């Protein structure tokens, strides 16, 4: 008998659990949302978001631009970064710009963690939207108290590229109001 690896088993378990929750509360879900394909798509998008946020604070993170479509846009407050090169610029990993001073080195911290909560993911075939709350936590040195440094909302749109979900737009915003023109 062939055994599934830990990752395969976890993935199948997550799909099964999501399906069980969906079936257990049918009044909260539309028929379209209950389709197995949509449940899997939502789980894949949630996995993409989780892996993206787990990159923060890691010594050797995955390339942030790999989470985005080629023509994607990252919006941080009033600053817009377009395409994969622009996104790499946003994270200080792109080629140096002639008109910009060099970025200071990242601060050394004992722990930097970003958590994600309340994800609302809506799939529309080959596109999707997600909104969520993120919270940044820092411990400067071992033994120091935990500090919440930032909390805000992310509004993202997604597209399927070669069978994989990628960010099309990712907007980080404070406050309670969604971005102008936002649609689930």
Over which residues does each language-model region extend?
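Bacterial N-terminal signal peptides that target proteins for export
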Residues: 1-15
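Bacterial N-terminal signal peptides
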Residues: 13-24
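Short, low-complexity N-terminal intrinsically disordered segments enriched in polar/charged residues
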Residues: 28-58, 62, 66-70
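Transmembrane beta-barrel outer-membrane domains
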Residues: 43, 109-112, 147-149
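A solvent-exposed, acidic/Ser-Thr-rich amphipathic alpha-helical stretch
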Residues: 61-134
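Short, surface-exposed coil-to-beta transition loops
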Residues: 114-116, 149-154
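Short beta-strand edge/turn micro-motifs at domain boundaries
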Residues: 127-131, 151-182
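Beta-strand elements of well-folded, non-transmembrane domains
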Residues: 136-140, 158
